[in-house]
Every structure is written in C-alpha cells, then in structure tokens.
C-alpha cells in the first residue's frame, strides 16, 4: 500500500475541490495513484472536473523572439528562485541574450542552449546569489507569426494564414487567457478522447439509462469536451457570442499552430537553502 501523504491529499483537494476525507478515501482506493483517484471520483460524481497537475511555483520570465520576416520564432523560459530576481535588470538582460541567440542560431535543443551559456549563467548565479536555469525552448514557423506576453510570466506565439497583425494578436491574447491545448477538436489525440469517453460513459451508465441512450448522451458531452480543449472550439474571450473558429472564418483565416508557455508550468519550486546547497557542493568538490 502506497503512503498517502498530507501533500498528496492536499493536491487532490486542489485539483478536484472535494473534501479532505473524500480525497483521502479515493487515494487509498487508488493505492496513491492521484490520476486514477481523479478518474474514479469523476465517475462517482465526487469531482465533475479536475484541474491539471502542475502548480505554478517557480519564478522567472518567458520571452518570445520573431525573425524579421515574421515567419520563424522561438519562445524561451528562464527560471530563478524569487520574484525579486525575475525583475532584476541583469537577469532580464541575460534572458534576452539567450532568447536572441536561440532565434539567430535556431537553437531548439535545450542542452545545446544551456551549454552555450553555461559560463555566463554561472557568473550571474555568483553575482546574484540565486540559482538560474534555462528551462525550455521551442520554435514555431508559419506564414505569419504573432506574439503576446502577459507580465513576462505568460508568453504565446501563434502561426496563422490569412490573418492580419491585429487579429493574430487577439488570438494570442485569447490563448494566454483560455489555455487551449490543441488547434482544432479533431487534433485531440485518440487516446485522450478514448479516456474521456470511457469516463463519460461510466457516468452516464450510472444514471440507469440503457447503453444506447447513454452513448447518445456521451456524444454530446464529447463534443463539448473536444471543443473546450481546442482553440477553434472555445468561445472567444473578447466576444463570447462566437467561437474562435467562427471568428477565423469571418476573416478567412486559419491558425496553423501555437505555443503557450507559463512560468513554472509542471514544476513546483523546491524550498531549499541555496547557500547551504553551494556549501554542500564545495565540500564535495
């Protein structure tokens, strides 16, 4: 039996909104597997939906850089330990230099990018007194690229055809706010669809309806699900009366791809004493 820790119960509560005892029971039944616990809670009606894993706990900045022709761009995440350093001029200048190099040399391998700037990073760490990490980099190509940055913590890059700069900017702002995972409903992977379909079918069957009626109920729920996780299926944040897909159709435009980075996605900042860490490293040297 896996150990059911308080932090595991806390995470399940945060992701489902369910009570502490319900979460602890679900984790015990799932032998500590939080994803299985969430599935079981959804099937039983204890959790209607679940937030994605990965609390944003790291500090840092997201930078986007686009080539002069507007057809190629990169997006980079740089992490530090505190918000104070994230606003430091030296840290921001270093991050900008890294992003500029990634664009100029088309460096999208994170290890290559880290190696290129390791000496400068080490010097900056010694100067600032905090750990700094070049966390990830990605690229995007297209007929026209647009970007949006929200307070340096969220960065979006969009590739589109048939769109002007204003439209693509609005689409990027929508992506920053609504967090779509795919461009179109049909882009949702088959395994993701199958997983959600099974959950919705189990929920529908518990209502006592015959299977064929339950299947019909699930069809509607699945259309809603794929719409909610895809850009074109979402209601446009600036005009909820239409979907992003309808907006694009009005302008005879298409989105061919997008990237959305948010500082600290998928990681939780480990509370460590950096001075003690450096001291420990010195002893081991």
Swiss-Prot record:
Q: Which UniProt keywords apply?
A: Cytoplasm, Elongation factor, Protein biosynthesis
Which is a Gene Ontology cellular component entry for this protein? cytoplasm
Tell me, in one coarse class, where this protein mainly resides. cytoplasm
Alphabetically, the GO molecular function entries are: translation elongation factor activity
Q: Where's it found, cell-wise?
A: Cytoplasm
Instruction: List the Gene3D superfamilies hit by this protein, alphabetically.
Output: 1.10.286.20, DNA helicase RuvA subunit, C-terminal domain, Elongation factor Ts, dimerisation domain
Q: Where is the signal peptide?
A: none
**SUPFAM superfamilies recorded for this chain?**
Elongation factor Ts (EF-Ts), dimerisation domain, UBA-like
Top-level taxon of the source organism: Bacteria
Instruction: Kindly name one Pfam family recorded for this protein.
Output: EF_TS
Region annotated Involved in Mg(2+) ion dislocation from EF-Tu, chain positions: 82-85
Function, as annotated, reads: Associates with the EF-Tu.GDP complex and induces the exchange of GDP to GTP. It remains bound to the aminoacyl-tRNA.EF-Tu.GTP complex up to the GTP hydrolysis stage on the ribosome.
Instruction: Say which family it is in.
Output: Belongs to the EF-Ts family.
Q: What is this protein called?
A: Elongation factor Ts
Q: Which organism is it from?
A: Edwardsiella ictaluri (strain 93-146)
């Amino acid at each position: 039996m896996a150990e059911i820790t308080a932090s595991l119960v806390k995470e399940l509560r945060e992701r489902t909104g369910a009570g502490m005892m319900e979460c602890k029971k679900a984790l015990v039944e799932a032998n500590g597997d939080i994803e299985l616990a969430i599935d079981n809670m959804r099937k039983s009606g204890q959790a209607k939906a679940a937030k994605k894993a990965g609390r944003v706990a790291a500090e840092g900045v997201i930078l986007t850089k686009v080539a002069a022709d507007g057809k190629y761009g990169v997006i980079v995440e740089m992490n530090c330990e505190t918000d104070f350093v994230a606003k430091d001029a030296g840290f921001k200048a270093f991050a900008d230099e890294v992003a500029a190099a990634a664009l100029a040399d088309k460096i999208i391998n994170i290890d290559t990018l880290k190696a290129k700037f390791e000496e400068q990073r080490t010097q900056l760490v010694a100067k600032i007194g905090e750990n700094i990490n070049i966390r990830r980099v990605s690229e995007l190509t297209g007929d026209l690229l647009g970007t949006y940055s929200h307070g340096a913590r969220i960065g979006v890059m969009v590739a589109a055809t048939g769109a002007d700069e204003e439209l693509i900017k609005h689409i990027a702002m929508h992506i920053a706010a609504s967090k779509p995972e795919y461009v179109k409903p049909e882009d949702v992977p088959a395994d993701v669809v199958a997983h959600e379909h099974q959950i919705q079918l189990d929920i529908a069957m518990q209502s006592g309806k015959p299977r064929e009626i339950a299947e019909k109920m699930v069809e509607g729920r699945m259309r809603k699900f794929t719409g909610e996780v895809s850009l074109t299926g979402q209601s446009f944040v600036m005009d909820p009366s239409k979907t992003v897909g309808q907006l694009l159709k009005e302008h005879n435009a298409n989105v061919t791809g997008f990237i959305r980075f948010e500082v600290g996605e998928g990681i939780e900042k480990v509370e460590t004493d950096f001075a003690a860490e450096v001291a420990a490293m010195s002893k081991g040297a």
